[in-house]
């Protein structure tokens, strides 16, 4: 029986989806990043792309049938995301080849370029406007770039994203050597595989330095390196920890990235962006609830959680929303201990 336009229910998983006529409205092919199939299967609510011979679940992005199935990353689908408001599978509007980005964005980039060795360096802010943006039909949301030895997410702008890939941007600035410094004990081939997965899954434009490792997997966009490799960043270097960080977004659009876990199952959050926030939190790692209580991050930004690898899927999602983990008096040293030295990261209890 045909569905009426409006909200329906997934026959596979039971949570609500948006239904358009007989079928769910069109979705985005995770290989090309564009609109390849105008219709989805009505009963199973699965998206298909005849051109690439791929079928996937539009809710969590899980590939059901594809010759490239082993290359498509599996993104987690948290229960908190399954609401009638967030599970609309809609076609986002196409954008112009050169999006109209407000000048205030570039001004903020220059103004809030993070500290390096206690100095502000404006190279990122000066070169960013000259970079190219995605082709029409893609959905740019964030820009990844390298600050220090950290992978940082710059909030750009957000359209109405489909639910297939709501967590991954479409313009990625990546310096493999810095990425390797941040993701400890990750071989070069693994980093190349990671970029290839993102490329296949999202159709993202990946911008690499001109002289970085040549790859036979895909042809990334080449651009002059924004920064040379810088291996002594703010993130604590712990050789015994190989898990990556998590990327968040502040309410003012400033990015924040987490460091390695100080304890098992506990993310250690380290700020990498605006001058004010950097000065406030540069000497300690804060729980998300602490930053949330100070109105520094949106609650909805937790839904923009980005997982580079699958190790963090073991962290209970409820832990990230545990208000009891926030310590408002974290500035005060406890038990007579001295506060950490400048540039060091202290672990905050969760």
UniProtKB/Swiss-Prot annotation:
UniProt cross-references to Pfam families, sorted A to Z: Tax
Stretch list, region Interaction with CREBBP/P300: 81-95
Subcellular compartments: Host nucleus; Host cytoplasm
Transactivation: region residues: 289-322
TM stretches of this protein: none
Function statement: Transcriptional activator that activates both the viral long terminal repeat (LTR) and cellular promoters via activation of CREB, NF-kappa-B, SRF and AP-1 pathways. Binds to two 21 bp repeat elements located within the LTRs, referred to as Tax-responsive element (TRE). Binding to TRE requires the interaction with CREB1 and CREBBP. Activation of NF-kappa-B leads to up-regulation of the expression of gene promoters containing NFkB motifs like IL8 or BCL2L1. Inhibits the action of p53/TP53 and MYCB. All these functions could lead to the possible occurrence of lymphoproliferative disorders.
Comment on protein domains: The 48 N-terminal residues contain a non-canonical functional nuclear localization signal (NLS).
Protein name (record): Protein Tax-3
Designated gene of the protein: tax
